[in-house]
């Protein structure tokens, strides 16, 4: 029944699938087996929770995996279109800003790492710009088309694993 349901979903509109099993962060064999089944049905992108997040919290890992399944195909199409606009192989020369503020090669960029890439880019850009004036304590205000981010910097980056955005 599950395989028939997956075929119906895939034939209607979905080409991407998220697979989240409760204990896959410690034992991923079943997710790998499910991936083989889903790919055989014809899904073009399969996001596995054990790959998207190593945390034990099932719901958070599931949220991350679903976001990756939704966003990665869109990003992949964008990257393919971008490559097609250039002559020659430029794949090693294009990098994308990730949510953690780091850069990654376009071939490694994933949907889950793109969610906060804009705000991260604003922070990194502000810090680099302030360094030109030798300022090490700054408050940043980054207003874009869909969000506004306010942040501070006191000479070193702060990292967090747990955060809330808009109450979530």
Stretches found by the model and what they are:
Residues 1-168:
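N-terminally biased helix-coil "hinge/interface" segments that flank
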